[in-house]
Each structure stands twice: as C-alpha cells, then as structure tokens.
C-alpha cells in the first residue's frame, strides 16, 4: 500500500502536520507532495491519499489548492482511499471553520473515492456546517486549530493516524 500525502501550506502549519503524519505512519509508506511544487495528477499513482487543506480568510481555499482546484475534476480517483485533514481558526473564524475541508470532501465525493478518518466535533467551538456530517457529530477529516488548540494537535494527529490505519485495514481485508 503506497500513500501520497498532498498538502497546501502558506504558513507552514499544514506542512508541519504533514511531516508529523508521515513520521507516524512511516516514511517508507508515505510520500509528501507540496501542491506548490507537485502536480495533482500524481495523486493517480497512489492507493491511498491523505490530503491537507487549510481554510483561509472567510472560508476560502488556500492558494496552492486554489491553483489546482479545477485540475482535480480531471483526475481518475475511483476507488482510492482518501483521508482528509484541515487547518483553521475556530474562534476567530468559527462560522467558516474548516470550510475548505468540507469543499474538498464534497468535490472528491463525486469522484468515487472511499473516505476514512472522519473525526468527532466534540471539543471544538464553531458554527460552520460545511465540514461536518452525521448531524454535525463528525468532521469530514481531522480538524486542527494551531491558533487556539495547538497543545492538542500532536495527540489528535497520533490518534487520527491510528484510526485511519485501522479503517484502511478494513478496506483491504
């Protein structure tokens, strides 16, 4: 099983999370791709995709993702296992918290992918409904807030990595 971790990062937080995820899952399994430098077409060569997207300003897509957003429509991702993680500021921008994560999830849902890594909303304060499912009980991916809950990020990343490994194993069983 080969995993490609694709991310966009303007302030390095999404990139730092990518490196932590790679280190936990294993550098022999996970290859990092900064969308600033690498084409999204590379996603097609992986069995598993981990995609990191921060939300900018008032619910906007980060610039590296925005530059390749339309290219995602042309990719063949049918049957791929996809785990998402997002970065945002739940207190300063609660009504747009992780909107980009929700937009990416909705875009990929049309591509026939299998999602893993939904994450509980408990412990977060926000009002946006874009990044949630299950009557608001789950985020569509790991939710990270380096502005207000940086002290929880390492534990959340560790727990989420264990969770997605278990869910991936079920898909391959």
UniProtKB/Swiss-Prot annotation:
InterPro entries associated with the record: Flavodoxin, Flavodoxin/NO_synth, Flavodoxin_CS, Flavodoxin_lc, Flavoprotein-like_sf
Key words, A-Z: Electron transport, Flavoprotein, FMN, Transport
PROSITE patterns: FLAVODOXIN (PS00201), FLAVODOXIN_LIKE (PS50902)
Keyword Ribonucleoprotein: no
Cofactor needs: FMN
Superkingdom to which the source organism belongs: Bacteria
Pfam families per record: Flavodoxin_1
One GO MF term attached to the UniProt entry: FMN binding
Span of domain Flavodoxin-like: 3-165
Function recorded in the entry: Low-potential electron donor to a number of redox enzymes.
Family: Belongs to the flavodoxin family.
This protein's name: Flavodoxin 2
Organism: Salmonella typhimurium (strain LT2 / SGSC1412 / ATCC 700720)
Taxonomic lineage: Bacteria, Pseudomonadati, Pseudomonadota, Gammaproteobacteria, Enterobacterales
